[in-house]
Amino acid sequence: MGYRFLSVLVLVVLFGSCKNNVAPDTSSDKTAIAAMLDSFNRAAANAEYDRYFNFYTVDAVFIGTDATENWDKKSYMAWAKPYFDKKTTWNFTSIDRHIFFDKTGTLAWFDELLSTQMKICRGSGVVVKVGNDWKVQQYVLSTTIPNSQIDTVVSIKAAIEDELIKKLTSK
């Protein structure tokens, strides 16, 4: 009786400790995130303030193209409000997008090239599943610079950013 009990116990422990290493099927979530990001961009283009900011989590962060633009949601909303009120917002259209998931399938990150009034920009960020919806936790907007033009761009921004570097490194 003792041998049989021990054998069953060993089997229970062995099978109970096995993990399912199969990644969750994220294809429908990938479609949902892509649709959310498209709607997010349309809301900005249409100057729909509440709708646009509803795509962000409560504790979201927006990082803009200027080195000083690292805002929590409340600060970003305050900065953007005049543009939405005057209907002079931005119009971004994704032209190439990649979406990746963590092992749980409830956190994802993306990068995309955007057609904008600034020509090609890169949007990237982190999205999290909140209930049944995907929300933007962090968004980073970057301008792209052709490598052949980097020296020209650096010379244009050097004076401004040298001062900012001094300020930031003296903290």
Where are each of the predicted segments found?
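Short beta-strand segments and strand-loop junctions that repeat across beta-rich extracellular domains
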Residues: 124-133, 157-160
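Surface-exposed, charged secondary-structure patches
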Residues: 75-120
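Low-complexity, intrinsically disordered terminal/linker segments enriched in charged
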Residues: 138-171
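C-terminal motif of bacterial Sec signal peptides marking the signal peptidase cleavage site
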Residues: 14-17
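Short, well-ordered alpha-helical segments enriched in acidic and aromatic residues
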Residues: 46-59, 63
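A short gly/proline-enriched turn/hairpin at secondary-structure junctions
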Residues: 61-71, 82-89
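Bacterial Sec signal peptide processing site at the extreme N-terminus
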Residues: 19-32
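Bacterial N-terminal signal peptides that target proteins for export
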Residues: 1-6
